[in-house]
Design a protein with these regions (language model features):
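Acidic, glycine-centered low-complexity repeats within long intrinsically disordered regions
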Residues: 336, 343, 357, 378, ...
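Amphipathic alpha-helical segments of tetratricopeptide repeats
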Residues: 303-306, 342-347, 384-389, 426-430
Length: 433
């Protein structure tokens, strides 16, 4: 029985995923998926979301109602408020495994159902951190350890990103006891194609942007010297080397970062800019669309559509469904959703609202992709008309409209007209780029 427990714990420990941001010399670009890992941005935005949403008992009951097939779910529904979230997380229930799996796979459905618990656990760790480390300074820095098996792909990325940033996408269990981490490694040596690695983590207790806490006194399993970090803890990657006495094991030095880290601050600003949206959930959906995770984006917006009665929000969701299907190449479906969105916006927004211009423009894009150039021109011109009335003369959106109309005339063989609009686009671009 004890062996089975250890095997289950080892499996859960290895399921904690990591993601990488570019090194200091790399260009930050959301469209460069090899440089900026999707999961790094996903969990950062998810963390932002959970800090802005208020949860109550109805969310716990909803989770129980939708998860009745899971063991212990009724106990959790009845007794959830009787214990701290860390107690539930470290107890031998399904919560640990299901939550880490959802964060690893970026499963929007499960994450939304468990959002109340993710939020509560983060707040619990933050509160304990404040109590345990409130009077400590950088001079009292300490080291924690974590043993983990990495896939060869992740290990190669780790080596390639030395000097860059690494994020643990899940909640992260570590130990101040080096032997505890090494025991895990020795139990997993030689398994499959994985690389055994000991993370040696240097922790400045004065860093509050990444909460962590001692948990032995409230840990249901009651392991000693455990430090639990909240999700998306970000570290700077230092030296990576093989053990001198066992070349099967590698050691990687990590240093906890804070919000003052210039690269992390720049990255956070980029994430905010590239995924601006009306709500935090909408930001997450936009990110998934940008990274071509269309099924996950569709699942998220389907849930959001069921939860809202606000007409403007429905219009936005239908618009995003249109974007998803446009990018999939399913143009008839895209038109259907864009037109649903446009119908609502016409009823709820002023006649010259910028969102209407965006909607007309995107419908034009679909018709252009379908080769229906006269229809595309009709909608591009409607978009341009609004933009000329509401935007400054050198606004980039006007340049986009001129370029789009130029492309239509180009495709129709009307080259003099195409040239006229291309030149208008160029004139603005020279002033703004």
């Amino acid at each position: 029985c004890e062996a089975l427990k250890l095997a289950a714990q080892d499996c859960d420990q290895n399921s904690v995923s990591i993601s990488f941001a570019p090194t200091k010399d790399s260009t930050i670009n959301i469209t460069n998926k090899n440089i900026l890992h999707c999961a790094f941005m996903y969990t950062q935005i998810l963390k932002d979301i959970l800090l802005t949403i208020n949860f109550d008992d109805s969310h716990i009951n909803e989770f129980a109602d939708n998860s009745s097939e899971l063991v212990n779910v009724n106990e959790i529904a009845k007794e959830y408020r009787d214990h701290q979230p860390i107690w539930w997380y470290t107890r031998e229930t399904f919560l640990f495994s299901v939550l880490n799996r959802a964060l690893r796979l970026m499963d929007a459905d499960i994450i939304i159902k468990m959002a109340f618990f993710i939020s509560d656990l983060h707040k619990n760790i933050t509160d304990l951190h404040s109590k345990q480390f409130h009077d400590q300074t950088s001079s009292q820095s300490f080291i924690v350890y974590r043993g983990q098996s990495l896939s060869q792909t992740d290990f190669n990325q780790l080596k390639q990103n030395q000097g860059g940033l690494l994020a643990f996408n899940n909640f992260l269990s570590t130990s101040k006891n080096r032997k505890t981490a090494l025991d895990f490694i020795h139990r997993n040596l030689g398994k499959n194609e994985f690389v055994s690695i000991l993370f040696v983590m240097h922790i400045d207790p004065s860093i509050y942007s990444t909460p962590f806490a001692h948990v032995p006194k409230i840990n249901a399993i009651d392991e000693e010297e455990e430090i639990l970090f909240s999700m998306h803890s970000v570290f700077r990657i230092g030296k990576i080397k093989q053990f001198s006495d066992n070349t099967q094991i590698w050691e990687a030095e990590l240093t906890l970062t804070d919000n003052n880290d210039p690269q992390l601050r720049q990255l956070s600003e980029t994430i905010q800019k590239e995924t601006s949206g009306s709500t935090e959930w909408n930001r997450l959906g936009l990110l998934l669309i940008k990274l071509a995770k269309f099924d996950k984006a569709e699942a998220l917006y389907t849930i959001l559509l069921k939860q809202t009665i606000d007409q403007k929000e429905k219009a936005n969701i239908f618009h995003q469904f249109g974007c998803i299907n446009k990018d999939r190449g399913e143009y008839s479906k895209a038109l259907e959703y864009y037109e649903k969105s446009l119908e609502i916006m016409k009823k709820t927004l002023p006649a010259n609202h910028p969102s209407l211009a965006t909607s007309y423009n995107n419908i034009g894009l679909v018709y252009y992709s379908m080769g229906e150039y006269s229809k595309a021109l009709e909608y591009y011109e409607k978009s341009l008309e609004i933009r000329k009335k509401t935007l400054p003369a050198n606004h980039p959106d006007l340049a986009t409209s001129y370029n789009n109309i130029g492309l239509v005339y180009d495709s129709m063989g009307e080259y003099s007209k195409a040239l006229e609009y291309y030149e208008k686009d160029l004139e603005i671009s020279k002033k703004t780029l």
